[in-house]
Amino acid sequence: MADIEMSEASKTPVVAEEVVDPVQKANEASLLTFADLKKNIGLIDKGVDTKEMRFIISVLRQTQSIRKKLNYKVLNQIVNFAFSHQNHATKKNFLLSFLKSDGSSMDIDSTTQAEKETTPSSSSSHLNIEVESYIHLLVLIYLIDQKKYEDATKCSSALMETVQSNTRITLYPLSSKIFFYYSLSYEMTNNLHEVRSTLLSALRTATLRHNDEGQATIINLLLRNYLEYNLFEQADKLLANTQFPESASSNQFARYFYYQGRIRAIQLEYAESFKFLTQAIRKAPQNTAGGFRRTVYKLLSIVQLLMGEIPERNTFSQKQLKIALKPYFHLTEAVRVGDLGSFNQALEQNSDIFKSDQTFTLVQRLRSNVIKAGLKKLNTAYSRISFNDICTKLKFDGTTQDIMFIIAKTIKDGVIDATINYEGGYLQSRENIDAYSTQEPLHAFSNRIDICLKIHNDSLKAMRFHPDLNKAETEKIAEVAKTIKEEMERQAEESSDNEGDSDF
């Protein structure tokens, strides 16, 4: 039995675990990336030859996925592959000067079969400017990812000169990406002000050439540039003197609405700011762009508090927003209960966060709202209360005269319904009026209806219909109309004949 068991066991093959060589794995990944880049070059050439933008746009959609796979060796291969002709030696050497090995990359066989392969577009002396700009853009993105910002600014400046000196329509989709990374490279070196004149010139050119996506991108970059240096007046003038293209993408619209919301909030136009920020959230991607959504919700919560409204609690409990909005949740709690002490404590503890979020100025304006909320609460609880007691309950550190002026302003704004007795030194509350007997519910429903109608109209504008979808129905209606017209003419002729016979 033992011999039988051993013989059966010996028949079972022993499979050795396959050891994966890291260098070989890196080689295979680089070869696949190189093949993808060659395919993208072919698509760009096809888009240029057929004047079809969709091929170039499909290549740009793959930028984020390819961006993660880029490395020094792959970019060297694709630059040598695309600029193989001697006529492009200057451009080739310029790009290769940025692709210096840092010693951390694994060695990859540079004489692979992939490099030996050529295509007609690469072997010929002619190279489309779109392909040249695409490869240049990949090198720029790689430099930014490697945090080589000084090299990135030089690379982006040369790329901008190439784009501005060409007027080809097929370069428009690439130009919007180039504008963005050009501004980003200078922002990383804290020299964002240097690109302002270049972007203004590019905006004029894009407007004259009807480059809608490029125009939308540049407007957003200029708004970001102005707001970075707190130049709100210049940003407002830019909004007044430019028209944002309606054919821009949803992402560009989301950024545009956010910048408008920030500008209106600084200008004390909180209702307009709330409208723009709400539209920005609606236009932004729902499953991605978490950082953008957090930024918008931070500003939106402050604007709602400045409007006298309290943000919904479930906004602060969302998984993506819970940690980022925690300081703003403490502010909301302080404003809601009208506790000036809690507000000062939250402001002191989170002042650095508010400054980094660029909301510190708006948060400081909430002090009067906290006092108003506290006064509203006291006005509901007491029919009559002295000014000294109001200062004590609100933890107000000013004088009685100061609180008297604040109460007068609160009554004038319609926050509370009360009267001030200066001789007795107290606040006299009036009877509470039922809100449903006023016009407030009507205005609230009207605002909601307007929002729903706007969403409906935007959805209709965003829908696409096949041009031949209703062709059959149109032809059928035309035939019916033609038949009716012929029948009416025939009846008219018969009636005229009958009249002629009767006269005879």
Swiss-Prot record:
Cellular component GO terms held in the UniProt record: proteasome complex; proteasome regulatory particle, lid subcomplex
Region entry Disordered, spans: 485-504
PROSITE patterns according to UniProt: PCI
A GO BP annotation: ubiquitin-dependent protein catabolic process
GO terms of molecular function: enzyme regulator activity
UniProt biased composition (Acidic residues): 494-504
Pfam families on file: PCI, Rpn3_C
Subunit text: The 26S proteasome is composed of a core protease, known as the 20S proteasome, capped at one or both ends by the 19S regulatory complex (RC). The RC is composed of at least 18 different subunits in two subcomplexes, the base and the lid, which form the portions proximal and distal to the 20S proteolytic core, respectively.
Protein name: 26S proteasome non-ATPase regulatory subunit 3
